[in-house]
Amino acid sequence: WIMGHMVNEIYQIDEFVDLGANSIETDITFDENAVAEYSYHGVPCDCRRWCHKWEYVNDFLNALRRATTPGDSKYRRELVLVVFDLKTGDLSSSTANKGGKLFAQKLLQHYWNGGNNGGRAYIIISIPDIDHYAFISGFRNALKEAGHEELLEKVGYDFSGNDDLNSIRNALHKAGVKDKEHVWQSDGITNCILRGLSRVREAVRNRDSSNGYINKVYYWTIEKYVSVRDALDAGVDGIMTNEPDVIVNVLNEKAYKQRFRLANYDDNPWETYQ
């Protein structure tokens, strides 16, 4: 999965897919009532990126729905996975549950079209703070209460704060998520700073072990050719990047062409390849 980083304005959906992304990451900020308000990152953000692009969340979700609904004039067949990077820093552990519930209701209305032929992309809820695990519980419960538990088949989970893997596993269990139940594990840092791959390798070992909790591992945010090759050699399933075309170029290199291909809609992002 080539994951376009910081796609927060509607026009960027096409921009990143045109560059080769089959997945995008969108930042979501919350107001004081735990309501998702903007698709917005703010400063600081990655080097060589403008940090201030934004939309109202409802507008972005409506556009995203169109981009992932077959038959729509805005449909982009390649776009199969969306990561919502949830900026839960202003939520407390007590309002996280409410935030998750309200965000699920927003997705249900604006992205899934009330459960009636909405957007088809798989969704990852990515949370920076393991203490906010109740966001996931609230999200899951809201869909169940709305009578749309089936949409959870399309939802996966990630904690992005580079915490100890066992701590993340415990947070997932507290949220009601079982081992290997749609779990993506991220590792990374802003592209301004170099980061080693030791934790990535630990996550890959967990993914590949019979008693791990992880389905997929992704690394963020890189666009240097050597970094991309190193990440692929470490066995990641996804790379988050500001320059999707760089990842496309590396995947076309002889050393990687046989081992990797771009994921499409028929590839289940919750299955671990053996």
Swiss-Prot record:
Any one GO BP annotation for this protein: lipid catabolic process
Q: Where is the active site?
A: H5, H41
Q: Which InterPro entries match?
A: PLC-like_Pdiesterase_TIM-brl
Which residue ranges does UniProt annotate as crossing the membrane?
Answer: none
The UniProt keywords, alphabetically, are: Cytolysis, Dermonecrotic toxin, Disulfide bond, Hemolysis, Lipid degradation, Lipid metabolism, Lyase, Magnesium, Metal-binding, Secreted, Toxin
Quote the EC number.
4.6.1.-
Instruction: Please state what the protein is called.
Output: Dermonecrotic toxin LarSicTox-alphaIV1
